[in-house]
Amino acid sequence: AKTGNDYSRRVEEVAKAEGAEVLVIAGKTEEDIASLESYEDKQMFLDELGLEESGVNRLIKKAYALLNLQTFITAGEMEVKAWTYHRGWKAPQCAGVIHTDFEKGFIRAEVIKYADYIEYGSEAAVREAGKLGIEGKDYVVQDGDIMHFRFNV
């Protein structure tokens, strides 16, 4: 929903008076978006409605911000996975999200910035460009970091 309706505007007024936020989402529109198969179809539908992103995406982003959460990524040959952590956590704490042994035996983290990965297109190209970071226990993980943890237990 781009503008909401009379009811949502009344809710917005109450929320504003209480210092709270409101996120207007149109359930039927979200159902229609979810029923589309491809990313391209979803994007075309959003464009036709004059929306930049779905309400579900906006809800997730707002919830992450409200809860002070961020995401780091791990990638192997068989799987790429996103992990949720609290903003401000250091590398060993984030390693512990995967497994407590990773945190206990933390040695270092190899870090690729998401923007560098997009720019160079592969881990090998990032390494070749000298953009792979080797970080220790005091590194504060950044949203979107691609992490490879080294540990010994």
Predicted regions and their residues:
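C-terminal-of-GTPase-core extension/linker across diverse P-loop GTPases
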Residues: 1-142, 147, 152
